[in-house]
Amino acid sequence: MGFRFLDIVKPFTSLVPEVGQPDRKIPFREKVLWTAICLFIFLVCSQIPLYGIRSTDSSDPFYWAKVIMASNRGTLMELGISPIVTSGMVMQLLAGAKLIEIDQSVKADRDLFSAAQKLFGMLICVGQGVAYIWSGSYGDPAVLGFGNCFLIVLQLFFAGIIVMLLDELLQKGYGIGSGISLFIATNICETIVWKTFSPTTVSVGKGTEFEGAVIALFHLLLTRNDKVRALKEAFYRQNLPNITNLLATVLIFMVVIYFQGFRVDLPVKSTRVSGQQGTYPIKLFYTSNIPIILQSALVSNLYFISQLLYRRFPDNILVNLFGAWRTSEYSQQMIPVSGLTYYISSPNNMSAVLADPFHALFYITFMLTSCALFSKVWIEVSGSSARDVAKQLKDQQMTMKGHRDTSVIKELNRYIPTAAAFGGLCIGALTVVADFMGAIGSGTGILLAVTIIYQYFETFVKEQQELSGGIGGLF
């Protein structure tokens, strides 16, 4: 039996900023404009440096999740979408486990639950800000002083609120999609383009090379006498983006888009209008990119906690079992070398897989299991289970052809849980393959980018269908 946690939140709802529901139907062009404005605000905040910091040269605790969490080191977007994703994940899982009692059919409960998510997200902003300072990410806290430390946390707090409001603005229908998806896709695509065409030079043992894979290819071919060796280096150079990584990225993009088309169309008909028929599609990626977002949020927080503990207690046995870390000579970032965090981190390439096959096997098992479980749990807590879909069809005066209302749930249960679990499994498998192939932007990043871009494509198509009306617009 759950407790009325939402009643505890009620007195604080007046402190939570909220975007009101639109009082009219927003035209599609206006939605595009608001989406562009939200993206512009996010990109500007990603370039404004935090006031009061002394240094950002130290290892970044969230280095592993920077691209996925749409964050930018040393700026207002230091935390990115991490607070809102973490708060949403925790609250949804608590509601799904019935530890928080909520009736989704009651508007007051839905509003309180949304306010509770925001409050928790605001607390996470403060907590992560304090943890960043305590870890010395911006310099020695004693040197920074209380005033600067307070200002840094305050800036991160208000930046977190801005992200929440931008996300809510889009989700309430003023724009297209969600802020979280928009910011993730933008950050990942920016990273892929930069690592492909970056003109930045990097000093390596053989001299100076360009960071961008394509730029480096032409540079090596033009400056090296041995063209075959130059081509080989451009394809297989270590610790910098290479052409093989780029080709792997393109391949994964194409495979994910191909799998997006896999679906089962269930025939439905209207119980009100005779002869009106349509289909209800159940996709292979039924929960879309949610499993990988939740898995990334879980892992990034585990990394964060592990690094903080290891910096303070490097000789503690339990801390070392959780994760031991060292500084990479190439990126100057902390990387896990043993413990739980090491085994749930991805091997960088096939050489690393062959060097430690147990690590690779553990990582594969962890990714596949966690993505499948998160996908299964998500359909229950997000209102997309067989029972919820059957209720939606009934509310729209629709039913499945050849089935009575009482047997619709049973028929949907044949497809939805399987699609959720198997779809999550496929998402995890594609992520693992992309990681092992060394795809640019990480396997997780590419999966997120492709699924988000595909969602936007579907949204554009749906908008066109709604203009023409009919049953096709419902599904």
Curated annotation (Swiss-Prot):
One of its GO terms (molecular function) is ribosome binding. One of its GO terms (cellular component) is endoplasmic reticulum. GO terms for biological process: post-translational protein targeting to membrane, translocation; SRP-dependent cotranslational protein targeting to membrane, translocation. Residues 1-32, 97-118, 167-173, 263-289, 375-411, 462-475 are cytoplasmic. It is a multi-pass membrane protein. Pfam families: Plug_translocon, SecY. The chain crosses the membrane at residues 33-53, 76-96, 119-139, 146-166, 174-194, 242-262, 290-310, 354-374, 412-434, 441-461. PANTHER family: SECY/SEC61-ALPHA FAMILY MEMBER. This is Protein transport protein Sec61 subunit alpha. It comes from Dictyostelium discoideum. The gene is sec61a.
